């Protein structure tokens, strides 16, 4: 039994070794065949790539030649020594002056010195400028057109002022600084200035100081309703009185206004007041000239 077991062990070991050797041999054989095929495949691929490169190179040369052949007619401007000696088409050089430069420029853009898009871009850039200037000029003309119409409307305004054929000139006799004028003192001053109590319960200055003739100007109370009561003047007081005259009036309007101004100044002196203009401001020489100008305007308006 021991011998049989030993024999089986030896046979098994030999079988295992044989299998290992056979596996190593087959693996080496496959590797050697792979390495042998790889150089062949690489050479074949290199040849195919080289062949494809040659075909592409030939195509490129053809395209370059075609592009090089196209601008040959434009080489007539160059010197004969600059033309390449390889091309046989450089022989018809003496025949080049016959065709004009303008004719081929429309058919083939290679004959012209400038690219076709550059020549087309020029009119396109100038065309939009013209409508812009026209659009800008139109509103400018529209804005300036109505300008002369404004003074035409304002011109008739000064003509309406001389049309006044009558006016009222007013003077005020006022107490000082918020004071009041006593009724008795006022009555004495008014009577001494030639006024007479009359219509509308106010005082009037007639052409005749005695109270006869047309009325030249009148005197009223500064406080509404502007009337007086001569019987109660002792109990009466007022901040001031107003003297007014209509223009045109009887006689000379300038002399009547001068008389009215003198009467106002006399009453102011009697009652201790001051003479004010129609705006209740202190009388000034400039304001007197304004009164005289108003009188002249009314006289001129009535004379026409």
UniProtKB/Swiss-Prot annotation:
Transmembrane stretches, start-end: 6-26
Biased composition (Basic and acidic residues): 121-132
SMART domains in the cross-refs: ZipA_C
Gene3D superfamilies assigned to the protein according to its UniProt record, in alphabetical order: ZipA, C-terminal FtsZ-binding domain (3.30.1400.10)
GO cellular component, one term: plasma membrane
Protein's GO biological process: division septum assembly; FtsZ-dependent cytokinesis
InterPro entries: Cell_div_ZipA, ZipA_FtsZ-bd_C, ZipA_FtsZ-bd_C_sf
Region listing for Disordered, in residue ranges: 31-165
Database matches in SUPFAM superfamilies: Cell-division protein ZipA, C-terminal domain
Domain of life the protein comes from: Bacteria
Periplasmic side stretches: 1-5
Alphabetically ordered keywords of this record: Cell cycle, Cell division, Cell inner membrane, Cell membrane, Membrane, Transmembrane, Transmembrane helix
Topological category with respect to the lipid bilayer: Single-pass type I membrane protein
Biased composition (Low complexity): 137-158
Annotated signal sequence range: none
Topological domain spans for side Cytoplasmic: 27-304
NCBIfam families for this protein: septum_zipA
Function: Essential cell division protein that stabilizes the FtsZ protofilaments by cross-linking them and that serves as a cytoplasmic membrane anchor for the Z ring. Also required for the recruitment to the septal ring of downstream cell division proteins.
Family (UniProt): Belongs to the ZipA family.
Self-association and partners: Interacts with FtsZ via their C-terminal domains.
Protein's UniProt name: Cell division protein ZipA
Protein source organism: Erwinia tasmaniensis (strain DSM 17950 / CFBP 7177 / CIP 109463 / NCPPB 4357 / Et1/99)
Phylogenetic placement of the source organism: Bacteria, Pseudomonadati, Pseudomonadota, Gammaproteobacteria, Enterobacterales
């Amino acid at each position: 039994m021991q011998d049989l077991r030993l024999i089986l062990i030896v046979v098994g070991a030999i079988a295992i070794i044989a299998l290992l050797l056979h596996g190593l041999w087959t693996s080496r054989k496959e590797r050697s065949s792979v390495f042998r095929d790889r150089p062949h495949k690489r050479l074949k691929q290199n040849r195919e790539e080289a062949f494809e490169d040659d075909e592409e190179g030939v195509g490129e040369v053809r395209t370059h030649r075609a592009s090089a052949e196209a601008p040959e007619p434009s080489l007539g401007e160059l010197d004969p020594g600059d033309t390449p000696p390889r091309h046989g088409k450089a022989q018809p050089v003496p025949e080049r002056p016959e065709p004009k430069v303008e004719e081929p420029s429309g058919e083939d853009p290679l004959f012209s010195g400038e690219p076709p898009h550059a020549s087309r871009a020029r009119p396109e850039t100038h065309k939009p400028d013209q409508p812009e200037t026209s659009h800008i000029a139109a509103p400018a003309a529209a804005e300036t057109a109505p300008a002369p119409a404004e003074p035409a409307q304002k011109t008739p305004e000064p003509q309406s002022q001389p049309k006044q054929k009558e006016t009222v000139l007013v003077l005020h006799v006022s107490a000082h600084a918020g004071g009041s004028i006593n009724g008795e003192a006022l009555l004495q001053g008014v009577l001494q200035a030639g006024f007479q109590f009359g219509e509308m319960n106010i005082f009037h200055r007639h052409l005749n100081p005695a109270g006869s003739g047309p009325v030249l100007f009148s005197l009223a109370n500064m406080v509404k309703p502007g009337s007086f009561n001569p019987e109660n003047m002792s109990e009466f007081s007022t901040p001031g009185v107003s003297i007014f005259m209509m223009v045109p009036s009887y006689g000379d309007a300038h002399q009547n206004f001068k008389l009215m101004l003198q009467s106002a100044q006399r009453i102011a002196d009697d009652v201790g007041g001051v003479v004010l203009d129609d705006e209740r401001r202190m009388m000034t020489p400039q304001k007197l000239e304004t009164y005289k100008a108003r009188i002249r305007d009314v006289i001129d308006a009535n004379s026409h």
